[in-house]
Amino acid sequence: MHRSPGVFFDHDKGKTHASGKLLFNCRVIPNRGSWLDFEYDVKDFLYFKIDRKKKIFASTLLLALGFTKLEIADEFYESEQFTFDPKTEKWKTKFNPENYKAKNFSEEVTNAKTEEVVIKLGDKINFLNAKKLANDGLKDILVTRESLFGKFLHRDVKINDEAEGTFSIGTELNDAVIQQILDANIHTLQISVTNSINKGPYLLTTILND
């Protein structure tokens, strides 16, 4: 079959899985040479195939090209630093209005300097509201432990010297993971910036499982 060279985007129209979930794909057709396909599976792992042969994690392709897993994370994701504050038992980070583009509700947010609650739990807040807070001088904030749930590590975190003593890039944070990190006396985390609109964690979870 002959097709014009180019990059083609498509999905399976929900026919692959019983849930009807749309599985997106991309095909790269060069002027000469092998076709390269990228596709998601139902678990949102990202794969590639050459000439429609066996699918392999997309991160494997990048690793073969000389990237490290950290370099892949740095290339495709921005990151934010969170530091645990033993006094308040909350996590300190920079206030970034961009984080509120993808949601209109919020966790509790405290001004790290004044210790004033500037956003109450469950308050509706959007980018414009967040931008106003930043313009009014809000820089560093404290957020609860629960606010980190569902976020993903941007760098490996080694908690001990055992074979499974490292939480790797792409590990999803939950209460148990955070507690093990704190028990190892590690109080600073680098976390990838993801959202539900245009920066999903799919490549991070692919890296983790590669």
Regions found by a protein language model. Give the residues of each.
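N-terminal non-catalytic structural scaffold regions of very large proteins
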Residues: 1-210
